[in-house]
């Protein structure tokens, strides 16, 4: 049996309630989602939700909805891990080893020059 009566008019499914706090909504338990539709950007702040990673942000027109979008669209995800940076060693012995290698390369003597004389006959 259906829980709703048939003569009940349909009501709104969602109600907008503005935030009651002035503190920023972006907390470890809040995520902000931006959805772009035909030049309009909709920003949603979702608090208390789990993380879900999207493979990438792409654009597709309504005419060609199966398209994956443009390759030149910038990736706007902010939660991406940064690529690992080159770490420099602070160990002085490693610095000395590389310094010695450089000095060996630059100071390796080439063949000694010999004087060439031209003899005219």
Swiss-Prot record:
<keyword id="KW-0945">Host-virus interaction</keyword>
<feature type="compositionally biased region" description="Basic and acidic residues">
    <location>
        <begin position="88"/>
        <end position="102"/>
    </location>
</feature>
<feature type="compositionally biased region" description="Polar residues">
    <location>
        <begin position="58"/>
        <end position="70"/>
    </location>
</feature>
<dbReference type="GO" id="GO:0039593">
    <property type="term" value="P:symbiont-mediated perturbation of host exit from mitosis"/>
</dbReference>
<keyword id="KW-1048">Host nucleus</keyword>
<dbReference type="GO" id="GO:0052151">
    <property type="term" value="P:symbiont-mediated activation of host apoptosis"/>
</dbReference>
<comment type="function">
    <text>May act as transcriptional regulator. Induces apoptosis in infected cells. Element of infectious replication cycle.</text>
</comment>
<comment type="similarity">
    <text>Belongs to the gyrovirus apoptin family.</text>
</comment>
<keyword id="KW-0053">Apoptosis</keyword>
<dbReference type="InterPro" id="IPR006858">
    <property type="entry name" value="CAV_VP3"/>
</dbReference>
<feature type="region of interest" description="Disordered">
    <location>
        <begin position="57"/>
        <end position="121"/>
    </location>
</feature>
<dbReference type="Pfam" id="PF04771">
    <property type="entry name" value="CAV_VP3"/>
</dbReference>
<protein>
    <recommendedName>
        <fullName>Apoptin</fullName>
    </recommendedName>
</protein>
<dbReference type="GO" id="GO:0042025">
    <property type="term" value="C:host cell nucleus"/>
</dbReference>
<keyword id="KW-1098">Inhibition of host mitotic exit by virus</keyword>
<keyword id="KW-1121">Modulation of host cell cycle by virus</keyword>
<feature type="region of interest" description="Disordered">
    <location>
        <begin position="1"/>
        <end position="28"/>
    </location>
</feature>
<keyword id="KW-0244">Early protein</keyword>
């Amino acid at each position: 049996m259906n829980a709703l009566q048939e003569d009940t008019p349909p009501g709104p499914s969602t109600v907008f309630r503005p935030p009651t706090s002035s503190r920023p909504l972006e907390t470890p338990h809040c995520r902000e989602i931006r959805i772009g539709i035909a030049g309009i950007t909709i920003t949603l702040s979702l608090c208390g939700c789990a993380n879900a990673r999207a493979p990438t942000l792409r654009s597709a027109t309504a005419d060609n909805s199966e398209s994956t979008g443009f390759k030149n669209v910038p990736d706007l995800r902010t939660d991406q891990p940064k690529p690992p940076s080159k770490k420099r060693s602070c160990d002085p012995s490693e610095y000395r080893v590389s310094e010695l290698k450089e000095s060996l390369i630059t100071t390796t003597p080439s063949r000694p020059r010999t004087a060439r004389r031209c003899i005219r006959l």
